[in-house]
Amino acid sequence: SDVYKRQLFACLTGLRKSDIRQLTWQQIQPYTNGRMFVTTRMQKTKEIVHNPISDEAYGLLGERGEGLIFEDFKDKMLQGPLQRWLTAAGITKKITFHCTRHSFGSLHVEMGTDMAVIQAYLGHKNITTTQIYSKIAAQQMCQVVDKITLKRKEA
């Protein structure tokens, strides 16, 4: 369904609901290397971002058309199916459409993407905003805790 595709597109791009709601086909264009890019003025910050999107994300958009990519994008149409999917999966935590943006940032941190790259992709002016979105996994913290030591290396 379109709702399902919107949700997955948001997960793969980190775009806000307000930006996806107004996304048009004219904003998605190939770059010189053939990679598809989305260029949009973020509704919240008014910053212009020019970001590549994965082939998988582009594939979710379906056949290229004119005007808005996702028509009839209303909050009620999103939240109802999302809650049904969560219930069916046995998930009781409150999840909203915006959680896709958090997931995008958090997954990139877990995969080792540089924080400055995540910041630029999400269009954050301040790195501390990115750090809030991207909660560093405890496992990663455990991996680095022993890297600094007072012990001398044996010769």
PLM region spans:
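Short, contiguous acidic/charged loop-to-helix segments that flank catalytic cores in large enzymes
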Residues: 39-48, 67-74, 93-99
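Catalytic-site neighborhood detector that most strongly recognizes the C-terminal catalytic loop/helix
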Residues: 42-46, 75, 122, 126-147
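Active-site/catalytic core of tyrosine-dependent DNA strand-transfer enzymes
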Residues: 52-92
